[in-house]
């Protein structure tokens, strides 16, 4: 094991000498997908709770499709399927985009987490105490101001525990990136196994690194929950 770590630690952590690899790529995939998917989900969640069915239905359909199909299949559709379409082949921008395994992986991860996060945020919006909304209306808040100052801040705090689980799941989902030949942590572990024929060591090292990242994320979310959800915990009585 020591020999493998000494030889491959750089590739496992950030580079093989030619490109970024390993943990660096895994974190990059996670950050890109979570940030872009989260921002998009925030707007879709507002539409998801809309009383207008023409706004609500397309968003429901989007979340149904991406939550109802495996992420692995979605990645294969983007990476292997899209490039076979004539419209993609004939459009320079689309051609260049779907030719990249990294682009396809980020797209699949972003849309997948967006679908789940939309439902998390929508559920949190529905859970905002009605009294807060009525008070905002009584003060003459417009719909935009009410969402910006009252509903979204409360909803995001309510959604934090469920959203933290989604982020951890997305970290695990980045392991599918090797399917698109993206040199993430699992891809490097597979390459080490192919070179050394020591699968327990190769994948064991990868597992330890995933655990370290997961622990760091869980710790960050716990600190956030203690800070922003403290007022929501019942006070102790003596």
Where do the protein language model's features map onto the residues?
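Transmembrane alpha-helices and adjacent helix-loop boundaries
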Residues: 1-238
């Amino acid at each position: 094991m020591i020999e493998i770590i000494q030889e491959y630690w750089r590739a496992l952590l950030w580079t093989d000498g030619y490109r970024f690899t390993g943990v660096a790529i895994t974190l990059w995939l996670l950050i890109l997908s979570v940030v872009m998917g989260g921002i998009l989900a925030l707007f879709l969640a507002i539409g998801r709770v809309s009383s207008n069915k023409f706004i609500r239905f397309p968003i429901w359909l989007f979340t149904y499709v991406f939550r109802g199909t495996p992420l692995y299949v979605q990645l294969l559709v983007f990476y292997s399927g899209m490039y076979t379409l004539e419209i993609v082949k004939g459009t320079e921008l689309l051609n260049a985009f779907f030719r990249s395994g990294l682009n396809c992986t980020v797209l699949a991860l972003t849309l997948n987490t967006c679908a789940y996060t939309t439902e998390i945020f929508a559920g949190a919006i529905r859970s905002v105490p009605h009294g807060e909304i009525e008070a905002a209306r009584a003060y003459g808040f417009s719909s935009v101001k009410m969402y910006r100052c009252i509903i979204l801040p409360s909803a995001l705090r309510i959604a934090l525990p469920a959203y933290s689980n989604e982020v951890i799941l997305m970290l695990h989902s980045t392991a599918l990136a090797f399917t698109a030949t993206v040199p993430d942590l699992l891809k490097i572990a597979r390459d080490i196994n192919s070179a050394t024929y020591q699968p327990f060591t190769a994948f064991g090292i990868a597992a330890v690194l995933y655990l370290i990242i997961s622990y760091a994320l869980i710790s960050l979310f716990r600190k956030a929950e203690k800070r922003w959800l403290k007022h929501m915990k019942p006070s102790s009585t003596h």
